[in-house]
Regions:
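Active-site neighborhood of divalent metal-dependent phosphoester bond hydrolases
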Residues: 79-81, 86-116
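A generic local structural motif
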Residues: 23-25, 38-42, 68-71, 115, ...
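Metal-dependent phosphodiesterase/nuclease catalytic metal-binding core
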Residues: 116-190
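Generic structural signal for residues in well-ordered beta-strands
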Residues: 15-18, 109-112, 129
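Short, well-ordered amphipathic alpha-helices
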Residues: 66-72, 93-99, 144-145
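Conserved beta-strand hairpin/beta-sheet module of binuclear metal-dependent hydrolase folds
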Residues: 1-49, 142-145, 151, 180-188
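Short beta-strand or tight-loop elements
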Residues: 34-36, 108, 125-127
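Active-site metal-binding motif and surrounding structural segment of the metallo-beta-lactamase
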Residues: 39-88, 114
Length: 190
C-alpha cells in the first residue's frame, strides 16, 4: 500500500478510527469496519476501499481530495462511491466534478446525496447515521453514527421463547430499538 499521507490510528472497542486532521490543512477520517469515511481533505490510498463518505462542509481542508478519491476508485474498477454532503453545496459540488471530469478526461462517477439536520441514513441493520446542525463560516453539518440493537420489552422478560413467539405472531411488537452513539474516546453528557 502506498504511504502517501499521515494516518493516525485509534482503537475503540471493536472499531478502528483512522485518519488525520490539522486545521486549515487537511482532515480525513474513516472507520474501516463500517466501510465509511468522514471528510476528504486528503485521500490516503488505504481509504480507497471506503464506498461511503460523509462530508461535513466544503472548505478545502475537508473536501479538496474528493475528485482524486472518485477518480482513484474508478481507476481501481471499484463501484462509484456514495458521498453525503450538506444540501447547500450539492450544486457547486456537481459542477466541480463536471469540471474535473473535463480536465481529467475521466468520468467522475459518484452518488452525491444532499443531507440536512434531522436526516437519518441507514448504513446496515446494526448502524445508522443521523445528521445534526453545526455552526461554521460555511454551510456545515455533523454526523453521529449509532449502533442499534433490539431489546426485549420489559413486560415480556421471563416468558418462554414460545410465548414470546406467539405474541409476536399475533402482531404485537415484543422488542424495542436501543440506539447507542459511537463516540470514539468520549463519553456522552446528558
Amino acid at each position: 500500500m502506498v504511504d502517501n499521507l499521515p494516518v493516525r490510528t485509534h482503537k475503540h472497542r471493536s472499531l478502528t478510527i483512522e485518519g488525520y486532521s490539522r486545521a486549515a490543512v487537511q482532515s480525513y477520517w474513516r472507520v474501516p469496519e463500517l466501510r465509511l469515511g468522514f471528510d476528504l481533505g486528503g485521500a490516503p490510498w488505504s481509504f480507497t476501499g471506503n464506498p461511503t463518505v460523509f462530508i461535513t462542509h466544503a472548505h478545502l481542508d475537508h473536501m479538496a481530495a474528493l475528485p482524486a478519491f472518485v477518480a482513484r476508485r474508478r481507476m481501481m474498477k471499484m463501484e462509484p462511491p456514495t458521498i453525503y454532503l450538506p444540501e447547500q453545496v450539492l450544486e457547486a459540488t456537481e459542477l466541480l466534478l463536471k469540471i474535473w471530469q473535463r480536465l481529467d478526461r475521466g468520468r467522475m462517477n459518484c452518488k452525491l446525496v444532499p443531507v440536512k439536520p434531522g436526516d437519518s441514513i441507514e448504513l446496515s441493520r446494526e448502524h445508522l447515521v443521523t445528521v445534526f446542525p453545526t455552526k461554521h463560516t460555511v454551510p456545515s453539518v455533523g454526523y453521529l453514527v449509532w449502533e442499534r440493537r433490539k431489546k426485549l420489552r420489559p413486560e415480556f422478560v421471563g416468558m418462554t421463547q414460545d410465548q414470546i413467539r406467539d405474541i409476536r405472531l399475533s402482531g404485537k411488537e415484543v422488542s424495542w430499538e436501543v440506539r447507542t452513539p459511537l463516540l470514539g474516546d468520549r463519553k456522552s453528557v446528558v
